[in-house]
Design a protein with these regions (language model features):
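Beta-propeller blade termini and top-face loops
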Residues: 1-185
Length: 185
Protein backbone atom coordinates (compact mmCIF):
# COMPACT_ATOMS: atom_id res chain seq x y z
CA UNK A 1 0.00 0.00 0.00
CA UNK A 2 2.93 2.37 -0.74
CA UNK A 3 3.99 2.44 2.93
CA UNK A 4 0.65 3.74 4.16
CA UNK A 5 0.43 1.22 6.99
CA UNK A 6 3.12 -0.14 9.24
CA UNK A 7 3.20 -2.86 11.85
CA UNK A 8 5.54 -2.89 14.84
CA UNK A 9 6.81 -6.40 15.48
CA UNK A 10 8.15 -6.36 19.02
CA UNK A 11 9.62 -9.83 19.25
CA UNK A 12 12.34 -9.79 16.62
CA UNK A 13 15.78 -10.06 18.24
CA UNK A 14 17.50 -7.51 16.05
CA UNK A 15 20.69 -5.96 17.31
CA UNK A 16 24.38 -6.42 16.74
CA UNK A 17 26.45 -7.04 19.86
CA UNK A 18 30.19 -6.46 19.84
CA UNK A 19 30.67 -9.00 22.64
CA UNK A 20 28.52 -10.50 25.39
CA UNK A 21 29.05 -11.54 29.00
CA UNK A 22 26.89 -13.51 31.44
CA UNK A 23 26.68 -13.67 35.22
CA UNK A 24 25.57 -16.35 37.67
CA UNK A 25 22.16 -14.97 38.67
CA UNK A 26 19.31 -17.47 38.90
CA UNK A 27 16.94 -18.73 37.72
CA UNK A 28 17.93 -17.38 34.28
CA UNK A 29 21.40 -15.90 34.00
CA UNK A 30 21.37 -12.42 32.43
CA UNK A 31 23.27 -11.58 29.27
CA UNK A 32 25.07 -8.23 29.01
CA UNK A 33 26.66 -6.62 26.01
CA UNK A 34 27.27 -3.59 23.92
CA UNK A 35 24.95 -3.33 20.93
CA UNK A 36 26.43 -1.27 18.12
CA UNK A 37 25.22 2.36 18.23
CA UNK A 38 22.80 1.52 21.03
CA UNK A 39 24.46 1.82 24.43
CA UNK A 40 24.98 -1.26 26.59
CA UNK A 41 22.16 -3.55 27.64
CA UNK A 42 21.21 -6.51 29.76
CA UNK A 43 18.48 -9.08 29.50
CA UNK A 44 17.54 -12.61 30.49
CA UNK A 45 18.83 -15.76 28.81
CA UNK A 46 15.37 -17.29 29.26
CA UNK A 47 12.02 -16.54 30.83
CA UNK A 48 9.10 -18.51 32.21
CA UNK A 49 6.62 -16.15 30.57
CA UNK A 50 4.57 -17.70 27.79
CA UNK A 51 5.49 -14.95 25.31
CA UNK A 52 9.21 -15.70 25.70
CA UNK A 53 11.87 -13.02 25.88
CA UNK A 54 10.48 -9.69 24.70
CA UNK A 55 11.71 -6.10 24.41
CA UNK A 56 10.30 -5.36 27.88
CA UNK A 57 12.81 -7.75 29.43
CA UNK A 58 15.84 -5.80 28.19
CA UNK A 59 17.25 -2.74 29.95
CA UNK A 60 20.00 -0.20 29.35
CA UNK A 61 23.12 -0.46 31.47
CA UNK A 62 25.12 2.34 29.80
CA UNK A 63 24.80 5.08 27.20
CA UNK A 64 26.72 5.89 23.98
CA UNK A 65 28.16 3.27 21.66
CA UNK A 66 28.13 0.08 23.68
CA UNK A 67 31.15 -2.18 23.56
CA UNK A 68 32.45 -4.94 25.75
CA UNK A 69 30.69 -5.81 29.00
CA UNK A 70 32.03 -7.92 31.86
CA UNK A 71 30.44 -9.33 34.99
CA UNK A 72 31.52 -10.00 38.55
CA UNK A 73 31.43 -13.78 39.16
CA UNK A 74 30.45 -13.28 42.83
CA UNK A 75 28.31 -10.14 42.98
CA UNK A 76 25.64 -10.42 40.29
CA UNK A 77 24.63 -6.79 40.77
CA UNK A 78 28.03 -5.53 39.50
CA UNK A 79 28.51 -5.14 35.75
CA UNK A 80 31.24 -3.39 33.79
CA UNK A 81 30.43 -1.70 30.50
CA UNK A 82 32.31 0.59 28.20
CA UNK A 83 31.92 3.15 25.48
CA UNK A 84 34.25 3.65 22.55
CA UNK A 85 37.88 4.62 23.20
CA UNK A 86 38.02 2.92 26.60
CA UNK A 87 35.27 4.76 28.49
CA UNK A 88 34.96 2.15 31.25
CA UNK A 89 32.18 2.17 33.89
CA UNK A 90 31.28 0.03 36.89
CA UNK A 91 27.52 -0.28 37.22
CA UNK A 92 25.58 -1.35 40.30
CA UNK A 93 22.36 -2.86 38.95
CA UNK A 94 20.68 -2.60 42.37
CA UNK A 95 21.25 1.10 43.01
CA UNK A 96 21.69 2.23 39.39
CA UNK A 97 25.01 3.90 40.27
CA UNK A 98 27.40 4.29 37.32
CA UNK A 99 31.02 5.15 38.15
CA UNK A 100 33.66 6.02 35.55
CA UNK A 101 36.68 3.85 36.30
CA UNK A 102 38.82 4.45 33.21
CA UNK A 103 42.54 4.32 34.07
CA UNK A 104 44.31 7.67 33.76
CA UNK A 105 47.91 8.55 33.01
CA UNK A 106 49.96 9.95 35.89
CA UNK A 107 51.36 13.47 35.79
CA UNK A 108 54.15 13.69 33.24
CA UNK A 109 53.04 10.61 31.31
CA UNK A 110 51.59 10.76 27.79
CA UNK A 111 47.81 10.56 27.47
CA UNK A 112 46.31 7.09 27.38
CA UNK A 113 45.61 5.76 23.89
CA UNK A 114 42.68 3.36 24.00
CA UNK A 115 41.42 1.03 21.32
CA UNK A 116 37.98 1.62 19.83
CA UNK A 117 36.82 -1.52 21.67
CA UNK A 118 39.23 -1.77 24.63
CA UNK A 119 39.55 -5.20 26.27
CA UNK A 120 38.50 -5.85 29.87
CA UNK A 121 38.89 -8.99 31.96
CA UNK A 122 37.54 -9.76 35.43
CA UNK A 123 39.71 -12.31 37.20
CA UNK A 124 37.76 -15.53 37.81
CA UNK A 125 40.13 -16.23 40.74
CA UNK A 126 39.81 -12.85 42.47
CA UNK A 127 36.69 -10.95 41.29
CA UNK A 128 37.90 -7.61 42.66
CA UNK A 129 40.87 -7.82 40.24
CA UNK A 130 40.34 -6.27 36.82
CA UNK A 131 42.58 -6.05 33.79
CA UNK A 132 42.02 -3.34 31.19
CA UNK A 133 44.09 -2.12 28.27
CA UNK A 134 45.02 1.13 26.62
CA UNK A 135 48.39 1.20 24.87
CA UNK A 136 49.49 -0.70 27.97
CA UNK A 137 47.86 -3.23 30.30
CA UNK A 138 46.38 -2.00 33.59
CA UNK A 139 45.49 -3.93 36.76
CA UNK A 140 43.10 -2.99 39.55
CA UNK A 141 42.72 -4.88 42.83
CA UNK A 142 39.59 -2.98 43.92
CA UNK A 143 37.08 -3.18 41.05
CA UNK A 144 38.54 -0.20 39.21
CA UNK A 145 38.84 2.34 42.02
CA UNK A 146 42.63 2.39 41.56
CA UNK A 147 44.79 1.21 38.67
CA UNK A 148 48.46 0.44 38.13
CA UNK A 149 50.07 -0.12 34.72
CA UNK A 150 51.67 -3.58 34.45
CA UNK A 151 53.20 -3.28 30.99
CA UNK A 152 54.96 -0.78 28.81
CA UNK A 153 53.73 0.51 25.45
CA UNK A 154 52.45 -2.48 23.44
CA UNK A 155 51.71 -0.47 20.29
CA UNK A 156 53.64 1.17 17.48
CA UNK A 157 52.28 4.56 18.63
CA UNK A 158 51.38 5.50 15.07
CA UNK A 159 48.61 8.02 14.64
CA UNK A 160 46.59 6.45 11.83
CA UNK A 161 45.27 9.83 10.64
CA UNK A 162 48.85 10.81 9.82
CA UNK A 163 49.63 7.60 7.88
CA UNK A 164 49.23 7.71 4.10
CA UNK A 165 46.43 5.58 2.67
CA UNK A 166 46.73 4.94 -1.05
CA UNK A 167 49.43 7.62 -1.17
CA UNK A 168 47.38 10.31 0.56
CA UNK A 169 47.23 11.48 4.16
CA UNK A 170 43.80 11.98 5.63
CA UNK A 171 42.91 14.93 7.83
CA UNK A 172 41.24 15.45 11.17
CA UNK A 173 38.46 17.22 9.29
CA UNK A 174 37.22 13.91 7.84
CA UNK A 175 34.14 13.75 10.02
CA UNK A 176 33.26 10.27 8.79
CA UNK A 177 36.55 8.96 10.08
CA UNK A 178 37.56 10.83 13.22
CA UNK A 179 36.40 8.95 16.30
CA UNK A 180 34.95 6.15 14.22
CA UNK A 181 37.66 3.73 15.27
CA UNK A 182 40.96 3.55 17.09
CA UNK A 183 43.19 6.52 16.35
CA UNK A 184 46.47 4.72 17.00
CA UNK A 185 48.10 1.48 15.86
Amino acid sequence: DDSETWKFVGNLPLTQFYKVAVNNAKPFYPIFGGPQDNGSAGGPSATDEIEGIANKHWYKTLFADGHQSATDPVYNNIVYAETQQGGLYRIDLTSGEKVSIQPQASDGEPHERFNWDAPILVSPHKPSRLYFASYRVWKSENRGDEWIPISGDLTRNENRIELPIMGRKQGWNNAWDVGAMSNYN
